[in-house]
């Protein structure tokens, strides 16, 4: 096995371990896993204020549990004044019991067997597609694990959104890789005729790379060493090799969708924007990624037929940010984004302009030609202040290429000299089959809802899935 960098030493395996709750995942820092402590350079008063706010939030959450559970279940009968385990009657496709808990004014249905104590639940964040909390549960293999519960936001609002939910629930069941998150549970408390809420449970994989990079910027001290950076890049490529071999494009690679443990084990998260490339499809959308990590062909040309090489561009943006600590192309809107890209990577040459015209139109070519022309800069000069290795610069130059047909592939990248110390071909798996998502046909939002219901009904739990009390393993 290749060695793995950590905050204080180099452990011996890069295969992800399923850890007990006593050793929760955390970023590679020397901060305690079990106590909230201020960083060395953190302002004490600010930290104390944040701790008081967190305690107040926990107190409010505790007060809301009983009230919201009663409202959601209609059960006003209490065993005693201290009783807080108010469970619904068996409901949903598998007739499970739930406790309804209010977190940040959002009601979460948490299945029986999961920890619902106020101090055990943590709100991790939310976005346009859902909200995520962290708790723990005893799993089928007997271990108690930290898990992340994602409640999808308005999953069946329209056909486009409903198809996205279907893809994510489908892919999280298909993915089986050390560096890729997978579904440990998929459930709903609703009945089929009133199916509205979808929950997906995954392992809690640690803090996001975005949070770690932000910590570096906020506290003014570097957390990730050169060895960390190299190992992170290797693991992303290792995961992309598997994803791309299944003819899947992730489409949303960014620091916020990557998580790290204390041992620097990496997991790719959130497959809500991923999709299959198995069949020719002209419905690939332009505005899928966070703009800063979008490839030029996603921003302007080939917007209907870009390939998984767009993921490789995103990897280049992430690699550069790992080196410098700052986003590489922080554009405010598409035109500004494109200008930032060409200022570093150069404007399209005649060969690429011809491809753009052939694949799109002369009008698109004319627009691109109207921008200020830039020559590609010397990456060694641009990044010299950060003392990167020659191999790092060489890989970065091959990732950040305007013409996707000349961009390095994942199969080539994993063999690059920069990653030689971690490369282990026999432990860099490909998918054993092409993933057919059955999502290319147009459907109504109700038809997509029916498809998601079937995914929940047919979900096969893993050995690491939370145990359902009193129910035989399925």
UniProtKB/Swiss-Prot annotation:
Question: Which amino acid positions bind ATP, per UniProt?
Answer: 124-132, 150
Q: Which residues carry this modification: Phosphotyrosine?
A: 287
Composition bias type Polar residues, residue spans: 30-48
Comp. bias regions, Low complexity: 1-13
Q: Which reaction does it catalyse?
A: L-seryl-[protein] + ATP = O-phospho-L-seryl-[protein] + ADP + H(+); L-threonyl-[protein] + ATP = O-phospho-L-threonyl-[protein] + ADP + H(+)
Which cofactors are required for activity? Answer: Mg(2+)
Instruction: Quote the subcellular location field of this record.
Output: Nucleus; Cytoplasm; Cell projection, Axon; Cell projection, Dendrite
Q: Which Gene Ontology molecular-function terms are recorded?
A: ATP binding; MAP kinase activity; protein kinase binding; protein serine kinase activity; protein serine/threonine kinase activity
**What is reported when this gene is inactivated?**
Weak defect in the extension of body wall muscle connections or arms towards the ventral nerve cord. Double knockout with madd-3 suppresses the muscle arm extension defects, eva-1 and rab-7 expression defects and restores the defect in the recruitment of madd-4 to the muscle membrane in the madd-3 single knockout. Triple knockout with madd-3 and unc-54 results in paralysis (as in the unc-54 single knockout), and suppresses the lethality phenotype in the double madd-3 and unc-54 mutant.
Q: What enzyme class is recorded for this protein?
A: transferase
Q: Show the active-site residues.
A: 252 (proton acceptor)
Cellular component aspect of the GO annotation: axon; cilium; cytoplasm; dendrite; nucleus
Question: Protein kinase domain location, by residue?
Answer: 114-419
**Which PANTHER family does this chain map to?**
MITOGEN-ACTIVATED PROTEIN KINASE
| Function (record text) | Responds to activation by environmental stress and pro-inflammatory cytokines by phosphorylating downstream targets. Involved in axon regeneration after injury, probably downstream of dlk-1 and mkk-4 and upstream of mak-2. May phosphorylate mak-2. Plays a role in cilium length regulation, possibly by reducing rab-5 mediated endocytosis. Plays a role in the formation of muscle connections, also called muscle arm extensions, between the body wall and the motor axons in the dorsal and ventral cord.
**How does the entry describe the domains?**
The TXY motif contains the threonine and tyrosine residues whose phosphorylation activates the MAP kinases.
Protein name, UniProt field: Mitogen-activated protein kinase pmk-3
The uppermost taxa in this organism's lineage are: Eukaryota, Metazoa, Ecdysozoa, Nematoda, Chromadorea
